[in-house]
Amino acid sequence: MTFSVTLVIVAVTVLVSWRAFNDRALMDRLILWPPAVERRKQYDRLLGHGFIHADWMHLLFNMITLYSFGGAVERIFAQWIGIPGFVLFYLSAIVIAILPTYLRHRNDANYRSLGASGGVSAVLFAFILFDPWSKLIIFPIPVPIPAFVFAGLYVGYSIWMERRGGDNVNHSAHLWGAAYGVLFTLLLEPQVFTHFTQRLLHPSGN
């Protein structure tokens, strides 16, 4: 059986989240609470929040998505920067994706954020660069849609909901995670852009 660091990340996240569900002190220590970063210098929260989730549905949605697409991205990245490089990509995505949120709410004692969505979005959008015509099943759409169509819908919806607000979802982290996934991949291997456009224009080509 081939070793999968994606599966290790999923397992660690599930274990930490499960523990935090039953340990309020752990949840409070890892959650992104901006004043704790700003005043207490608890910078680990910028990463730690990505390993805890609000509930089982939140956790399962993120981890199923990560497991579904992480393996393919891991294998490609491993050829370029090794397995540690892929791990660094995922962990740094969690941090980068939350930074705009932290800066916006740095003095807001009532704001909290948690979840792996920033890192998961980065992995998903890196995958879309590699295979834009891959079919994705997205609730509540009843039929599979091409990955690049999903990407457009995802970005548009996230921008709209970020401006609208009121649903207790950190859409900013989704957007910045997606942007980081694309930028990191293209900086790592600029030829991916050519591959993406060729695949987009010639879906049946090799």
PLM features per residue range, with description:
Residues 1-206:
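A detector for small-residue-rich transmembrane helices and their helix-helix packing motifs
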